[in-house]
Design a protein with these regions (language model features):
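Short, low-complexity N-terminal intrinsically disordered segments enriched in polar/charged residues
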Residues: 16-41
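Short solvent-exposed beta->alpha transition segments
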Residues: 29-30, 34, 45-97
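Exposed beta-sheet edge and beta->alpha loop/turn motif
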Residues: 87-130
Length: 130
């Protein structure tokens, strides 16, 4: 009986020490949140750099994208008194299309909330917005 208890205790310790692997969809979800947090804090260039086309965009178009992000935040400020925070909700992996849908919750200053889906793809080892 004592040997069985020791074996059970040993197995429990080994199982408890098992390294927990972080799922790719969890990494993609956190990356999406970071991109939108950067946008929220006025780092428009970092947000645009998180888009799939960032390495092929001509400088003039990149500036237009940055201007669009500024206008978007201005519109949200006008309609909802701005975005208070972005929360990461969940992520769903689509193995057929090789992407992850990251579900974020925008919490506005007027107390309304909006759920947003951000399609994410992995490119060169980093998760970026599609």
């Amino acid at each position: 009986m004592r040997k069985a208890f020791i074996l059970l205790a040993f197995c429990s310790i080994i199982a408890g020490c098992k390294k927990e692997e972080i799922k790719p969809e969890e990494v993609a979800l956190q990356a999406a949140k970071v991109y939108y947090d950067q946008l929220l804090h006025g780092d428009y260039a970092a947000f645009v750099d998180g888009m799939n086309m960032n390495d092929t965009v001509v400088p003039a178009y990149r500036e237009q994208l940055i201007t669009n992000m500024k206008m978007y935040l201005g519109q949200q400020k006008k309609e909802h008194m701005g975005i208070k925070e972005v929360k990461a909700l969940r992520a769903v992996r689509d193995s057929v299309n090789n992407k992850v849908d990251a579900f974020l919750l925008f919490c506005f200053n007027d107390s309304t909330k909006e759920q947003v889906v951000v399609p994410m793809i992995e490119k060169d080892g980093a998760w970026i917005m599609r």
